[in-house]
Amino acid sequence: MVAPSLPDIVVYDTPGQDIPIWSHHTLRVLYALHRKGLPYAIVPLEYPDIEATFEPTSLLPKDDPVERYEIPVVLFRSRGGPNSDPDEYLMEPARIIAKLDTLVPNPPLPFASPRATEARTIFGPALAPILQIAVGYVPSVLSARSREGFLAKRQARWGKPLDVWVAERPQNKLLETAAPRLQAFADWLEGNGLQGPFIEGAQSGYADMTIVSILEYARLVGATDAFDAAMAHPRIARLYATLVEKDQMAARPPQVATIC
């Protein structure tokens, strides 16, 4: 029996003006692709063009009247070989990474293991204030056209302009909220009893990529105080550094492609 050929992988993403990748959702997917050793190309897509690009495709929209489609979208494009699957569009990092696990089972990227599930209950609240801080910086990294679309979507979702939403959540208060939560997560990591820097020990998984992608997002958009607050904890900094630096996740520039 002839094994199915792996598809070409195309990642649609909204770039920044000066930084090609900034979204924590996209970073999470790229980390997974690097971990699997899978090549990919990136197609840049301005924020207002997202819906018009994917509405004619087989990608099923979300049940969300504000954002029916969200970046990143990954196209698994068939190479047309024996037993190849048809083209498939996917969005939402968890679904995309589950697909990658079916294409290349090793190394696995556990999502719902007992340790990853427990970790999520601790790092989720710890990183929520960092996400709230970072979103206020996003418009400054976008092109004028994408910035306009991003701000319109945020206002539609929150019922108020982004700058008003941010002003209601002062950064110093969010950092105060984050401080004990980050400490609790660092203590949990330190006391995990496993060898290695990651949640499962020596092997990085989906949860580790989620954590690092959020920290990188904060750093890339300019939320330096939020990033530094997390990195002040040596155990969190170790997880981050091992994933980004030792595994060289950020040192492999993707091919930028256009799709006809």
Where is each model-derived feature located?
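Amphipathic alpha-helical segments that form well-ordered structural scaffolds
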Residues: 28, 32-35, 99, 177-188, ...
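GST-like domain detector, emphasizing the conserved glutathione-binding G-site
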Residues: 2-152
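Eukaryotic N-terminal targeting leaders
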Residues: 1-10, 245-260
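Acidic carboxylate-rich catalytic motifs and surrounding loops in phosphoryl-/glycosyl-chemistry enzymes
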Residues: 43-48, 199-204, 253-258
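Intrinsically disordered, low-complexity polar regions and short flexible loop motifs
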Residues: 235-244
